[in-house]
Amino acid sequence: MMQDLINYFLSYPEVLKKLKNREACLIGFSSNETETIIKAYNDYHLSSPTTREWDG
């Protein structure tokens, strides 16, 4: 699931910008949940390529 979100964010950077600015939230998720997901994405995106592994 997270890899799908990452691919989506990479394909639609304007959506990611709106989510980061709290102008929108992911369907089915609260604004707090969306913020947590965006933080996880940012942490993943800023991490070293050798540490980019998801448990799920």
Curated annotation (Swiss-Prot):
Record localization: Secreted
GO CC field: extracellular region
Transmembrane segments: none
Entry's Gene Ontology molecular function annotations: pheromone activity
Database matches in InterPro entries: Competence_ComX_Bacillus
Proregion positions: 1-50
Lipidated sites in chain (3'-farnesyl-2',N2-cyclotryptophan): 54
Modified positions (Tryptophan derivative) in chain numbering: 54
PTM annotation, UniProt: Trp-54 is modified by farnesylation, which is essential for activity. Modified by the tryptophan prenyltransferase ComQ before export to the extracellular environment. The type of isoprenyl derivative differs among the different pherotypes and depends on ComX primary sequence.
Keyword terms, alphabetized: Competence, Lipoprotein, Pheromone, Prenylation, Secreted
Top-level taxon: Bacteria
GO biological process: establishment of competence for transformation
SS bond partners: none
Subunit structure: Interacts directly with the sensor histidine kinase ComP and stimulates its activity.
Function: Part of a major quorum-sensing system that regulates the development of genetic competence. Acts through the activation of the two-component regulatory system ComP/ComA composed of a sensor histidine kinase, ComP, and a response regulator, ComA.
Other facts: The DNA sequences encoding comQ, comX and the N-terminal two-thirds of comP show a striking polymorphism, which determines the specificity of the quorum-sensing system in the different pherotypes of Bacillus. In ComX, the sole conserved residue is the modified tryptophan essential for the activity.
Protein name: ComX pheromone
